[in-house]
Amino acid sequence: MNRLEQLKNSGNKAFVAYVMAGDGGLHRLKEQVQYLQGAGVSAIEIGIPFSDPVADGPTIEAAGNRALKQGVTLQKVLEELQSWTFDIKIPLLVMTYLNPVLKFGIERFTTECRKAGVSGVIIPDLPYEHKQLVQPYMDKENIKLIQLVTLTTTDIRLDEILREAEGFVYAVTIKGITGSRDELSQDVKTFMQKIRKKSPVPVYAGFGISKSSHVDMLRDDVDGFIVGSAIVEAFNAGKIEEIEPLIRAVTTA
């Protein structure tokens, strides 16, 4: 069974933590994953640095640029994951743009992801209409291709995406790029309720989730939360003590 399915069956509110692979050096990724697993996160989304990250806000884009300057590549990240010998009990996700996957080779990418213990892949610039470009290879390796839906997704398109959704639905809470926000729009709550009512898989809210108040606002409307910029900022600033309160806010919801 894919670990994302195990997470769904647990019935707990999920906290998915995002880290940028290679921010501060690729050697830091292992200690970050170990810390987050020990702190109680439900899954970890590992970002692959890319030179044209169209969905990333300033915090994650800056982290990606720092990683690129360290020479971090998709291949190096997958090799790093495959080298780990400690026990990973939670799902690992890879978030990458399409271009690095095409350059690496789609079949090779999914094979190496499986060897690395990856449970799901997020490709934000892969249009839903073209998901068959990678879907057969994902299916072969039992890796879930995670779909994103946004506030601007039409009802017809939303129904199409949800009909074939797997792993979980990545529900974007803002219009625009990733990043921390002070407040979320009230429209978001209605949007999440609509998705959750229709979705056959868990619905996780992401993009802009950075405060306990965001969790409080949506706790009854989603199955989990994805937190990126706030965690990247905390690791970069050496303020990891700021991470655990966010985790507790979700996992005790």
Task: Cite the ranges covered by each PLM segment.
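Glycine/Thr-rich beta-alpha phosphate-binding loop at enzyme active sites
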Residues: 60-62, 70, 148, 158-197
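Catalytic beta/alpha-barrel core
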Residues: 69-71, 117-130, 144-153, 158-159, ...
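Glycine-rich phosphate-binding active-site loops on the catalytic face of alpha/beta enzymes
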Residues: 43-52, 116-122, 126-130, 171-179, ...
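Hydrophobic faces of well-ordered beta-strands that scaffold small-molecule active sites
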Residues: 15-19, 44-46, 92-96, 121-123, ...
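C-terminal helical cap(s) of enzyme catalytic domains, especially alpha/beta-barrels
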Residues: 56-64, 230-253
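Active-site beta->alpha loop and helix N-cap motifs at the rims of alpha/beta catalytic domains
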Residues: 44, 48-50, 61-126
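N-terminal amphipathic alpha-helix/helix-capping segment at the start of soluble metabolic enzymes
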Residues: 1-19, 81-82, 86
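Catalytic cores of alpha/beta
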Residues: 26-36, 153-164, 205, 209-225
